Amino acid sequence: MADVIAAMLAPLDYDSFSSEEDCLKAYCPADKYSPSKVADLLDNLPFHGVEFTWSAHEVETQDWNAEWEETVKFEPIIIGDKCCIHGLNSENVPQCKYDIIIAPKMSFGSGHHETTAQLLEEILMYFDDGKNVSSECSVLDMGCGTAVLAILAARCGASKVRAIEIDDWVADNAKDNVLLNGLAGKIIVECGDASLLGNGTRYDLVLANINRNVLLADMHSYISDLKANGTLMMSGFYEEDLPMIKKCAESLGMKYVRHRSRNNWTVAIFSAEI
């Protein structure tokens, strides 16, 4: 039920969700919040006989920041037996080939969510055994959140990584994480959206972990910046949305390669075979 409501809220500019027992918390920029739209949505939910109540309040960025810095101690996450993601104060951190430190500060991308975890696994496979590693390998990470995907790509061998995040506070968090991992010389973090693309730079690999509506709206920009034979990996949508994503990508000249899903969250991979 929570997944259905989250999917219906996404077009209303809600981009982050968390569930606690019988409560769904949804987050959107304050200037995008519309109580009338939320009320209309809840009045039309396809759940008969179920009563919903809701409330809203504005969350101060500094409060979240302080809370995370003081309390977050998430368990280390192991991805594909090769990558360990952990916080600054995580305990019992195992040794892995790729060690990544993340201070999430409420930004999306600690590696816990199915979309992030699956993309991390795909990045490991993309660079497996030195494959695709070269002095010219470039990666674009759209909607980078904590920049964990960009950081792993750089760790695996990408020589140049560009990470773009629309939220200025989240972009600052991404920059902090890049510095924490000693990758300031490899990763450039910018605040903005797909309008920053199209400057002539081409990428071997484009990662986009956002949401269905943004992916559909901006996919042409991602593809325009791919090198010949480049790879596009997208996530942030449900498995039932795959036909829509696939149709859009193929209409733009991309070749569908494969997809995978975990708890209905899906990653789709396409190739710009020219």
Q: Where are the model-predicted features located?
A:
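Class I S-adenosyl-L-methionine
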Residues: A6, A10, A39-P46, E69, ...
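SAM-dependent Rossmann-like transferase core, predominantly class I methyltransferases
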Residues: D63-V133
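S-adenosylmethionine
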Residues: E121, D129, I166-E273
